[in-house]
Regions:
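Conserved Class I SAM-dependent methyltransferase catalytic core
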Residues: 1-31, 45-46, 211
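Flexible loop/turn segments at secondary-structure boundaries
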Residues: 2-3, 166-169, 277
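C-terminal substrate-recognition regions of SAM-dependent nucleic acid methyltransferases
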Residues: 31-268
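Short, amphipathic C-terminal "tail helix"
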Residues: 265-283
Length: 283
């Protein structure tokens, strides 16, 4: 319930705004509580003190380390589980407010079914080139079945899967999200089914390649992780990732560390949470 879950929005807001939740203990790895049991997203328990409202003591257990902090649960619209991540997110959001006027990628990434085609749409023999599942690849969709309400069809597009970490339920281990093998660059005139989200669209391929290098950095994927507690990654999960507006050149973690003032200690934590992926290609 920290960040997602079907039908849990009301419950989450009630919990985050309840100052009587005084202690919240969080285990990323469910096996730390129930050995041999795999519970996706981990385990938490909390103390609700009816007559003693105040700040909440958040206790994180991460790779055998116990970390405590006191903080308001409703500082953000979702609950960031890691206390070590809070100052990093705060810092980057403050800089983004000055440099990019509070713009984040949750306003840029497409919603599900960007072209109105469901995952089970049947490939056609002719029509508009369409990216289906990774197994099927590039086939065709009938022109009359394709909608383009967001005016994406005639642009270059970076396609990303909505389930980039399928199979991973233990979030105490490093998370990858995106890499060369699970993203696609779609040309102008190509669409996709619900098997993809359009992460970014541009009039030039060069800007798409540049944006891909931004998405592949560990810092950006770390910011995404703060809003992800399941294998399903929707546009809303990008709420902490700054949208730089336009993209040029190749982005690196060293560049973003300097821009956002990430310390060595903060980088060590980021590096421990996000797995390394290969350098992004130009294709």
């Amino acid at each position: 319930w920290f960040a997602g879950g079907k039908g849990l929005d009301g419950f989450r807001q009630e919990m985050l705004n309840d100052k009587r939740v005084r202690i919240l203990t969080d285990f990323e790895n469910s096996a730390d509580v129930f050995p041999g049991v795999d519970v996706a997203g981990g385990i938490c328990y909390f103390l609700w003190a009816r007559d003693e409202p105040g700040l909440c003591k958040v206790v994180n257990f991460h790779n055998g380390e116990r970390i405590e902090s006191e903080r308001p649960l409703n500082e953000f619209p979702i609950f960031i589980r890691h206390s070590k991540a809070i100052p990093i997110v705060r810092k980057i959001m403050a800089i983004n407010a000055k440099e990019n006027n509070h713009r984040y990628l949750n306003e840029r990434v497409s919603s599900r079914k960007p072209f109105g085609l469901p995952t089970n749409y049947t490939p056609q023999h002719a029509g508009i080139p369409c990216w289906f599942t990774q197994r099927i690849g590039l086939k065709y969709a009938a022109k009359e079945d394709v909608s383009d309400n967001a005016n994406l069809l005639d642009k270059w597009k970076l396609l990303i899967p909505p389930y980039p970490i399928a199979g991973q339920t233990d979030f105490s281990k490093p998370v990858g999200f995106y890499y060369e093998g699970n993203v696609r660059i779609a040309k102008p005139g190509e669409c996709c089914t619900e098997s993809w989200l359009v992460a970014y669209a541009s009039n030039t391929k060069e800007e798409i390649v540049s944006f891909k290098s931004y998405l592949f950095t560990k810092i950006v994927r770390f910011l995404l992780l703060q809003a992800v507690v399941s294998q399903h990654v929707t546009r809303e999960r990008f709420c902490f990732v700054p949208d730089l507006g336009t993209y040029s050149g190749r982005y690196t973690d060293a560049m973003l560390r300097e821009q956002w003032g990430i310390t060595d200690e903060e980088w060590e934590f980021i590096d421990s949470k996000i797995s390394t992926v290969e350098e992004p290609s130009d294709e």
